[in-house]
């Protein structure tokens, strides 16, 4: 009897301990969200999405150029980062083997763990200095370097989950290996691959440090990929450290919009991940 009571008490104690640790994670997150909504919601209006920041001393304005700039940077980074990550994962999963593949995996893991500011410094050396100026292309390249290892490792793991019998059945019908990989293996893992892509986009959407060394920022519309471009994280950083209350309000509004976008991307990633589990 004493042994049974002890086991029940230990079970209740561990349950309470886990609940405390869970609350320790959730409470700060909820407080951050509540504070951002409290500070930024009042500044969200139509002008915020269609106007650029106004000069010092003038009220109103918005972050339309930052929204467009972030969308452009993410699009350009995805054009380079997603294909490289996916085809690299296909090589590792379907064709690779031995020390070279292990070297690629190790390099991807190291790259994903490098502070993003170092990635920005590398992009600055490789693109900004030779081009003699900050640009959207340099910013997109820096974000692509962050994106590639996430897409690569996620896609590789998803491809490994595809049953080998599907590959064997396709090959037995005389389908070439490359066609089997693209039409059977990759298609079967598509929902999982989408999860990795969305997580990578959510990661780079909020990056600020690499853009300070590459895109720099712009108070106006950018019409050339070889000139500095505005981005939401850069504008939030710039407005938050300014001494002007109007810019502080814009910074909080921008933070709310950016957090909402990242939250939506995370929910979409979870949706595709759940579809993948249900498919299995």
What are the residue ranges of the model-derived segments?
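Short membrane-interfacial helix/loop motifs at transmembrane-helix boundaries
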Residues: 27-60, 216-226
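Transmembrane alpha-helices
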Residues: 175-214
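Cytoplasmic-entry segments and transmembrane alpha-helices of multi-pass inner-membrane transporters
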Residues: 84-123, 150-157, 279-280
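Transmembrane alpha-helix signature in integral membrane proteins
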Residues: 61-91
């Amino acid at each position: 009897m004493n042994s049974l009571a002890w086991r029940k008490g230990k079970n209740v104690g561990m349950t309470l301990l886990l609940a405390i640790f869970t609350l320790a994670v959730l409470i700060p997150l909820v407080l951050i969200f509540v504070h951002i909504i409290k500070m930024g919601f009042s500044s969200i209006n139509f002008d915020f999405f269609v106007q650029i920041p106004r000069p010092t001393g003038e009220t109103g304005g918005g972050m339309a150029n930052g929204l467009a700039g972030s969308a452009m940077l993410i699009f350009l980074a995805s054009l380079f980062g997603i294909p490289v990550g996916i085809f690299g994962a296909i090589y590792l999963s379907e064709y690779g083997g031995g020390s070279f593949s292990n070297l690629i995996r190790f390099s991807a893991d190291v790259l994903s763990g490098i502070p993003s500011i170092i990635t920005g410094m590398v992009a600055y050396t490789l693109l900004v200095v030779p081009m003699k100026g900050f640009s959207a292309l340099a910013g997109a390249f820096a974000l692509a370097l962050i994106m590639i290892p996430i897409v690569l490792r996620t896609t590789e793991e998803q491809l490994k989950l595809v049953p080998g019998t599907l590959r064997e059945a396709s090959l037995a019908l005389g389908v070439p290996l490359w066609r089997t990989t693209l039409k059977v293996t990759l298609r079967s893992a598509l929902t999982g691959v989408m999860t990795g892509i969305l997580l990578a986009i959510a990661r780079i959407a909020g990056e600020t440090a690499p853009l300070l060394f590459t895109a720099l920022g712009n108070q106006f519309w950018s019409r050339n990929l070889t000139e500095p471009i505005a981005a939401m994280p850069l504008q939030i950083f710039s407005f938050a450290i300014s001494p002007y209350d109007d810019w502080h309000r814009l910074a909080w509004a921008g933070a709310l919009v950016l957090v909402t976008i990242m939250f939506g991307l995370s929910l979409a990633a979870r949706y595709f991940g759940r579809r993948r589990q249900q498919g299995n």
